[in-house]
């Protein structure tokens, strides 16, 4: 679950959604990384999906990144929303600020271009396999594979189905708007979807996109319910055990924070219980896709995707590789509580260790997240600071440590981690080891089971 190296800084991007606005959207529009994917890219998928990864009481679905505004539903970028506290230096440098904004815009362009270029990349991949068959195999060998060409043609058709969906997401983000002083929006196209030939495909970013497609199955399909039940349900049940005595309409005063929010489903599920829920996700790719799933989908099972076509190993039957999955299994507008204007639901982009607001949350939920840290001591310290005195930290996930091959990384045993947590004035209330999968292909010949640490601790720092 190594962090995707997104150029956007903490607090630069925000998707928010609360009960009031979702009701309006529903009435008017009906809108609103630990990955073993069972192929040779197992760790890559985790790296892309679960990484360090604001509250907006107006409730409009928003994606914030400086002063650029993208998409249609008043996705406002606020230049003054950038938090400089992460470097403990509040001196303003126009040149540095301009450089950062340029880098962020370039990274954003790269992500949108990747979404729009998926078919170009993937059809080339299919052609490479076809060329190997036609030019590298002997005629006798070809006769042994009479259905191979038909499979390649089916893969190409599946690529186009995926591309149709991904282009919908990319096209939503081709335009950004600069908010002028008189609040008028000046359109500025950052990517021209009709002119992509000059854009070089970034293969690392394309791997992130393929990983994100599989993440859609985990978070937004009926097939993903098995994994959600394994990982999300224990967290939700624990929230209800701790705060369930609070009347539903009053639970919005309990603020729950979810670092490594991925595609937003866990944050949405937490909000569905009546809690104010905020997620933070480091990958801008994930944030853009989650924005679409939370705010742009109009009906259940609206889209079909072929999430496993790029998995060429551990395949039992060709039909398993080519199969479709429909998304979403729910609409966010249907899960969010009605008639509760105090409830806040938001997602922001950035590194949660660089966006510290001390004593600001009642509960922190980490799911397949803490082992994304190169320095897990920093994670524990930040969690302690962010929680209010007496606040609760609920964790579910393994200790895969995806920075382990790098020299600047520290990997603790659970025994060492537990000692560290206690020394940071946390008190353990529950400890279990539970089995869970992560973005597994249910039809694959290889599926990995994680032994996950599920614990609940109370922050006993002084008030």
From Swiss-Prot:
The keyword S-adenosyl-L-methionine applies. InterPro entries: CARME, SAM-dependent_MTases_sf. One of its GO terms (biological process) is methylation. Its EC number is 2.1.1.22. Residues 1-64, 79-104 are annotated as: Disordered. Residues 9-58 have a biased composition (Low complexity). Carnosine binds at residues 371, 402, 450. It catalyses: carnosine + S-adenosyl-L-methionine = anserine + S-adenosyl-L-homocysteine + H(+). Keywords: Methyltransferase, S-adenosyl-L-methionine, Transferase. It comes from the Eukaryota. S-adenosyl-L-methionine binds at residues 215, 218, 260, 281, 351-352, 367, 379. Residues 79-93 have a biased composition (Basic and acidic residues). Gene3D superfamilies: Vaccinia Virus protein VP39. The keyword Membrane does not apply. Residues 94-103 have a biased composition (Acidic residues). GO terms for molecular function: carnosine N-methyltransferase activity; S-adenosylmethionine-dependent methyltransferase activity. PANTHER family: CARNOSINE N-METHYLTRANSFERASE. Belongs to the carnosine N-methyltransferase family. N-methyltransferase that mediates the formation of anserine (beta-alanyl-N(Pi)-methyl-L-histidine) from carnosine. This is Carnosine N-methyltransferase. It comes from Dictyostelium discoideum. The lineage of its organism: Eukaryota, Amoebozoa, Evosea, Eumycetozoa, Dictyostelia.
């Amino acid at each position: 679950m190594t962090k995707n190296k997104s150029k956007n800084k903490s607090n630069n991007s925000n998707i928010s959604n609360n009960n009031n606005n979702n009701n309006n959207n529903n009435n008017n529009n009906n809108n609103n990384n630990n990955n073993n994917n069972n192929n040779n890219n197992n760790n890559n998928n985790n790296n892309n999906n679960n990484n360090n990864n604001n509250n907006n009481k107006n409730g409009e679905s928003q994606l914030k990144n400086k002063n650029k505004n993208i998409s249609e539903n008043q996705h406002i970028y606020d230049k003054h929303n950038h938090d400089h506290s992460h470097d403990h230096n509040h001196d303003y440098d126009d040149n540095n600020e301009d450089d950062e904004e340029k880098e962020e815009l370039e990274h954003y362009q790269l992500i949108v271009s990747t979404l729009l270029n998926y078919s170009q990349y993937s059809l080339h991949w299919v052609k490479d396999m076809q060329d190997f068959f036609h030019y590298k195999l002997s005629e006798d060998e070809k006769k042994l594979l009479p259905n191979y060409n038909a499979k390649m043609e089916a893969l190409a058709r599946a690529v186009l189905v995926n591309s149709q969906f991904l282009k919908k997401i990319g096209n939503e983000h081709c335009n950004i708007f600069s908010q002028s002083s008189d609040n008028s929006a000046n359109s500025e196209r950052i990517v021209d979807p009709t002119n992509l030939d000059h854009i070089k495909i970034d293969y690392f970013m394309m791997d992130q996109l393929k990983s994100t497609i599989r993440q859609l199955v985990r978070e937004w399909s009926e097939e993903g319910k098995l994994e959600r039940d394994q990982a999300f349900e224990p967290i939700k049940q624990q929230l209800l055990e701790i705060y369930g005595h609070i009347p539903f309409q009053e639970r919005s005063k309990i603020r729950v924070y979810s670092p490594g929010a991925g595609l937003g489903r866990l944050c949405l599920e937490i909000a569905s219980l009546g809690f104010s829920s905020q997620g933070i996700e480091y990958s801008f790719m994930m944030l853009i896709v989650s924005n679409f799933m939370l705010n742009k989908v109009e009906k259940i099972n609206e889209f079909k995707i072929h999430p496993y076509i790029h998995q060429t190993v551990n395949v039992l039957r060709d039909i398993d590789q080519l199969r479709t999955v429909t998304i979403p299994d729910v609409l966010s507008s249907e899960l969010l509580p009605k008639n509760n204007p105090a409830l806040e639901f938001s997602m922001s982009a950035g590194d949660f260790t660089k966006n510290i607001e001390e004593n600001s949350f009642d509960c922190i939920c980490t799911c397949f997240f803490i082992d994304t840290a190169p320095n897990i001591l920093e994670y524990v310290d930040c969690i302690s600071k962010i929680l209010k005195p007496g606040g609760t930290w609920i964790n579910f996930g393994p200790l895969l440590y995806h920075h382990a091959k790098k020299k600047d990384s520290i990997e603790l045993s659970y025994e060492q981690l537990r000692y560290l947590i206690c020394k940071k004035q946390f008190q353990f209330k529950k400890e279990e080891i539970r089995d869970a999968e992560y973005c597994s292909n249910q039809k694959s010949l290889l599926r990995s089971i994680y032994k996950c640490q599920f614990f609940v601790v109370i922050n006993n720092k002084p008030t």
